[in-house]
Structures are given as C-alpha cells and as structure tokens.
C-alpha cells in the first residue's frame, strides 16, 4: 500500500498572540510542524504535502527538502485545506493520512499503527482516537455494535448519554485516497462558519456504504494540539520528559530529569551524567563518560568522551576527549579545545584553538589565537585581538609559558619553548627559548611612608 501524508499548516493561530507563525513555535528545539513532518517521514510515505497559508515562506524554509507545499489562499476549513492537494494526490492509489501541524507529540509509531490498522480493516476512512481522562470540549466517537464509527459528536451538539463517552477524535484521519477525493467533492459549507469540514467526509463515506472505523491509540497525551502558550508549555514538558527518558534508556544518567532541558536533536553517549538545571540545545553531540554539572548551557557543540563541563556555557564549539572547563567559563563560537586541555574558572575563548594538554587556569580571555600543546597560561592573561576596526591573530608555540597578568597584543607569534614574564605587555614576536619581559622596573622609595600627609588626629609611629 502506497502511503501519503497531508499536513495542515495554514492557520494563523490568533490565540498564540504572536508575530511568529503558529506552527513554527518550537518544542524542544524544533518547530511544531517539523516534529509532525519528521514523524510522518519515518513511516516512509511516497509523498508529504504541507498546506501552507500565513507565513508560507518561513514554513517552506523550515521544511525544505522534507515536503511538497501547496498554498491555501483563503482559510475555509479543514476540508478546504485538504482540497488544495488535489493536484498532487487525487490521481494516486493508496492511503492518505491527514494531520495538523500544531500537534507536535504524535510519534511515528502511532502513524505506522494507524496505517496498518486502516489497511487490515479494509476501511475507507479510519479516525485516530484516544481515551480522554476529561473529554470536555472534544468531539466524541460514537460507534455501532460492530465497533464501526457512526459519527463524531461535538460537545455543543451531544446528548447527555453521548457526552459520557470518553473516546475522542484526535483530528488525525487515514483515508483510502480515491474515496477521499470522491467524498471531498461532495462536502459543502452550509454551516454557521461557512467552512468545509473534513469530518463531513466520514458521513458521506458511511452513507455511500463505505466502512468507517477508528483506531484508538493508548497515549492520549500525543493528541495535544497547541493553540496557546499554555498548551505550548505543556507540549514542551511532555516532549522533554519523552526525550530525557529516551536518553536514560540508552544509558545516560539524569540526576534531576525534570529540570534538564535537552533539545530533540541532541545526542548523548552512555555513562554520561547530566545534573539538574542543565540546558543542551541544537545539534549538540556529547560523548560517553562525561559530566555536565548544574548551570551549564551547551548549544550546537561537539563534546568528546570523558569531558567535564562545570557550570559553563559552550556555543558552537568543540571539546575533544578528556578535556574540562569551568566553573563559570565561556566557549564562544569556533573554539576548539584539544585533547587533555584544561580551562579553569572564568576563562573565555572565542575563535581560538587550545592545544593538547594546555592549561588555561583562570580569569583569561583567548580570542583569535592558536595555542600549541603543553602550554601554561597564567592567571589574568589577555589576548588583545581588536584595534577598534579589525581583529588580529596570535600564535603561541608548544611548551611555552605565559606569566600571570600578561597582555599579548595581536598580531604576534610566540615560538615553541618561549617564556613571557608575568605582567608583561607583549607587542613583538618572541623567539624559541627566549624570555620576554615587557614591564617597568620595580623601584622601592625608601621612607616613602613618612612623606605621606597626616590628618589632624594622626602622628607618625
């Protein structure tokens, strides 16, 4: 059976009170509609068609290469939205799944089971349903004695006995593709909203003698639709729990999973420990046997094996195996920390390479620089890389020593085995085995204390 997917993503979402197109609001680092499309792609459909409207260009950019797109110029209901895909799907044989782009929690497993059930039962239409703890506000699924779906009753229209039903419509449907397009031509807009409803297709098919069934999924929470910021927060909470539990099943330890925020595309190796209050975002990859402590934030970075990150921020950077950083340090974009290097507290590195086994202990800024291996950088060292107009680069060779409080004014080259005395301001190259001293000589003024002025109530002692 060929599979097709239609994603409805044309609504504006006024209840979100936002300038951002609703389905582009993120849940754990991915737009809601991208979660939906990625789940659909996992069932390997022959086509995915996304119906776009408001913010179409932005949606197409997010889903580039993952879907075809059709514009719905006027938003005239769910049935009207599906009709826009006629040119892409109407001539095809198979089954079509219809899902909205603001339901980010549906899994590929649920879609796969819906397709399979639809095919096994020989249905013309299959409604994805769930048992709701509190079904108020949802459309209720009314079945006949054989379990076939008779109708979907909305809250405002239901009789008392119908409203006792807890099986609800999730808004996801699977149709025989040919039956769908025949029925859509019969859907009218004779209702208070003047819209074309996709749910009318079910009644049209049933009256035509076609079989309409329902597949009840076990997890009601998957069906959460996001229409406001409260629902967005709830979807994020559920997705975060799902992500963290997945990592834990793969061998990652979470000290307090409820407070660890991990984006959907993050990868973490086994035997790594994530403490509470950690944020890991984007396409970050973390190796095995690492420790990420409270207060750390890692974005779009690669962390090797055996790395310790202590209450630090890492952005678009690489830390190789057996390195450590922190507390309270910051890797800015394009920092490369090579194997065995140590960065202590209050160290900032930007667009710089720190070589193997090099130590940068504390209170240091390294920007636009390449440091070799086995270097010791003392406390309070500054790589002065900016003249107010341009950035300049400095290179420090292997096994060099940079004394505390020194400033290296770029661009300069410090050779292998060079020494820079503490509190020096270095403006010229330093050769191999040389020691550079660039500071004023110390002068001790004898009896200077006695030359200081006294207040009226003081005397020299």
UniProtKB/Swiss-Prot annotation:
Cofactor(s) required, per the database record: Mg(2+)
Record region (Pyrophosphorylase): 1-229
Classification via Pfam families: NTP_transf_3
Protein location: Cytoplasm
Family statement: In the N-terminal section; belongs to the N-acetylglucosamine-1-phosphate uridyltransferase family. In the C-terminal section; belongs to the transferase hexapeptide repeat family.
Region annotation (N-acetyltransferase) ranges: 251-461
Protein name from the UniProt record: Bifunctional protein GlmU
HAMAP family referenced in this protein's UniProt entry, alphabetically: GlmU
Keywords from the UniProt entry: Acyltransferase, Cell shape, Cell wall biogenesis/degradation, Cytoplasm, Magnesium, Metal-binding, Multifunctional enzyme, Nucleotidyltransferase, Peptidoglycan synthesis, Repeat, Transferase
Family annotation (InterPro entries): Bifunctional_GlmU, GlmU-like, GlmU_C_LbH, Hexapep_transf_CS, MobA-like_NTP_Trfase, Nucleotide-diphossugar_trans, Trimer_LpxA-like_sf
Binding positions for UDP-N-acetyl-alpha-D-glucosamine per the UniProt entry: 8-11, 22, 72, 77-78, 139, 154, 169, 227, 332, 350, 365, 376
């Amino acid at each position: 059976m060929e599979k097709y997917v239609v994603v409805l993503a044309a609504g504006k979402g006024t209840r979100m009170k936002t300038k951002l197109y609703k389905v582009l609001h993120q849940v754990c680092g991915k737009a809601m509609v991208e979660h939906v499309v990625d789940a659909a792609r996992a069932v390997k459909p022959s086509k995915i068609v996304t119906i776009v409207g408001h913010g179409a260009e932005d949606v197409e950019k997010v889903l580039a290469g993952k879907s075809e797109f059709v514009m719905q110029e006027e938003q005239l209901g769910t049935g009207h939205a599906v009709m826009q895909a006629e040119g892409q799907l109407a001539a095809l044989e198979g089954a079509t799944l219809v899902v909205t782009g603001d339901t980010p929690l549906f899994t590929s497993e649920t879609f796969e089971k819906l397709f399979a059930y639809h095919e096994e039962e020989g249905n013309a239409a299959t409604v994805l349903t769930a048992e709701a703890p509190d079904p108020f506000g949802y459309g209720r699924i009314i079945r006949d004695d054989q379990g076939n779906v008779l109708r979907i009753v909305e809250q405002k229209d239901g009789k008392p006995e119908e409203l006792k039903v807890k099986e609800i419509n999730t808004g996801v449907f699977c149709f025989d593709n040919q039956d769908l397009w025949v029925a859509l031509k019969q859907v009218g807009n004779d209702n208070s909203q003047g819209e074309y409803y996709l749910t009318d297709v079910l009644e049209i098919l049933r009256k035509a003698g076609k079989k309409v069934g329902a597949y009840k999924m076990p997890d009601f929470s998957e069906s959460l639709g996001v229409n406001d910021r409260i629902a967005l927060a709830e979807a994020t909470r559920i997705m975060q729990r799902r992500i963290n539990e997945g990592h834990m099943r793969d061998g990652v330890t979470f000290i307090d999973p409820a407070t660890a925020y991990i984006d959907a595309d993050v990868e973490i190796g086994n035997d790594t420990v994530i403490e509470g209050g950690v944020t890991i975002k984007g396409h970050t990859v973390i190796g095995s046997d690492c420790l990420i402590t409270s207060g750390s934030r890692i974005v779009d970075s690669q962390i090797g094996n055996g790395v310790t990150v202590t209450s630090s921020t890492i952005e678009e950077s690489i830390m190789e195996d057996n390195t450590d950083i922190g507390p309270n340090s910051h890797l800015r974009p394009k920092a490369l920390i090579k194997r065995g290097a140590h960065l202590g507290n209050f160290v900032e590195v930007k667009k710089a390479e720190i070589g193997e086994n090099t130590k940068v202990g504390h209170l240091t800024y390294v920007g636009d620089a390449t440091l070799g291996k086995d270097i010791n950088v003392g406390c309070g060292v500054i790589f002065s890389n900016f003249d107010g107009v341009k950035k300049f680069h400095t290179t420090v060779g292997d096994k060099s020593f940079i004394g505390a409080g020194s400033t290296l004014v770029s661009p300069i080259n410090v050779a292998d085995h060079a020494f820079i005395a503490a509190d020096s301001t270095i403006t010229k190259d330093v050769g191999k085995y040389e020691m550079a001293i660039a500071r004023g000589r110390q002068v001790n003024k004898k009896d200077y204390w006695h030359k200081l002025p006294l207040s009226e109530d003081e005397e020299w002692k």
